[in-house]
A protein has these predicted regions:
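Cyclic nucleotide-binding regulatory module and flanking cytosolic helices
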Residues: 1-36, 85-86, 118
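A generic structural signal for short hydrophobic patches within well-formed alpha-helices
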Residues: 22, 112-113, 221
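Glycine- and acidic-residue-biased ligand/ion/polar-headgroup-sensing regions
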Residues: 37, 48-61, 77-78
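Polybasic "coupling" helices that flank or enter modular domains
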Residues: 117-187
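Short phosphate-coordinating micro-motif centered on Lys-Gly-acidic
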Residues: 40-45
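Cyclic-nucleotide recognition modules
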Residues: 73-135
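Phosphate-/nucleic-acid-contacting segments
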Residues: 158-229
Length: 229
């Protein structure tokens, strides 16, 4: 139980809860484990549970009929996913896949909605999260309609840099995403990512060191993103 409470305390929507409030939620959670590449739910599923990540990473994706993967985002320990289906009671609009071995805590949609009704501060944080997702999707739509492949790859690197929370000109992203991960995020092929990474490395902007991806010149990367081509 203590490990559930510890993880719930790191989830953004529960930041205002005391230990008693967290304990009440923890008592309603189920523990799930998944192996790498195992599917948690798929587009069209009628499940509506909400998930909180204890350890590992989850990819939120859609697969086309031809099998091409379009990745929306990756989520890590302390984050939540699956809440949209819990709120609107419609079928899943995306798939969730374990990118690593994964441990989750699962809360039913009925318990999630009851908590939102009982705790207005949680409802407000859920709305703030949904607003964030809408803004992120709007940004993606702009990029796909305006940017070429190279700019989209650069924009994804910039997004990863900002998501790291580091406040310096040199950003260390760990673990480094694979070229295939980046490609699925920006709807291109792995070879295009490899070429662009090579170009950025030759310009002194990017460096791969073991499992670390180091952005050496954040300001220059941002300028390249804005120089649409």
């Amino acid at each position: 139980m203590d490990d559930i409470i510890e993880i719930l305390a790191t989830v953004e929507i529960f930041k205002d809860l005391d230990r008693e409030g967290l304990t009440r939620i923890a008592e309603r959670c189920w523990r799930d484990r998944y192996n790498r590449r195992q599917t948690i739910f798929t587009v069209g599923d009628d499940s509506a549970d909400v998930y909180f990540i204890k350890s590992g990473r989850v990819g939120i994706t859609i697969f086309s009929e031809s099998g091409k993967e379009i990745s929306f985002r990756q989520q890590k320990a302390g984050e939540m996913f699956g809440e949209i289906a819990a709120i609107d009671r419609l079928r899943r609009s995306t798939s969730a896949v374990a990118l690593t071995n994964l441990e989750l805590f699962r809360l039913s949609d009925s318990d999630f909605l009851r908590i939102m009704r009982e705790r207005p501060e949680i409802s407000i944080r859920v709305m703030q999260r949904l607003a964030f997702l809408v803004r992120a999707l709007s940004e993606r739509i702009f990029e796909f309609t305006t940017y070429g492949v190279r700019n989209r790859i650069q924009a994804e690197l910039l997004r990863l840099a900002k998501a790291s929370g580091q406040r310096s000109e040199t950003i260390n992203i760990y673990p480094a995403p694979t070229h295939a991960d980046i490609a699925s995020q920006v709807s291109t092929h792995r070879e295009a990512v490899t070429r662009e990474f090579g170009h950025l490395a030759s310009e002194g902007i990017l460096e791969k060191r073991g499992r670390n991806l180091i952005i050496r010149n954040l300001a220059r990367l941002e300028k390249m993103v804005n120089d649409v081509n």
